[in-house]
């Protein structure tokens, strides 16, 4: 039932041996944010990978998700194999109605904390973030993102909801 760390670690190691450049990991797929997102959002979770981590946390009664529980080992593996960690975003807004809400901001702050922790261990990091945001909120959110000393990988079309379910075309 759920994931076993040994299996996840072995899959991560295999990717490293195969020569991948980066791996996306959802350290911020937290049940407290999920609970809040369910209460206030139109689309609570936008990430399939993050959703799987949330499901695992729920069925295994984890206080921290499987990746956060093993962050030190993940950092050591990434450092040893020169693999960049891409901080996945489980709660990026899937609609402009959820843009810059308390869940989005809190996840971004948690990503910032994890980014700094990994960088302090020598790990290279990039950050997935943004999602669907209206033009009037881009500057405010950009100020928060400017606190990262890491590249930002924007996901989702910033100023439009005109192509819902067609991000691959609208971007």
Feature map (PLM): residue ranges:
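Alpha/beta enzyme core
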Residues: 1-171
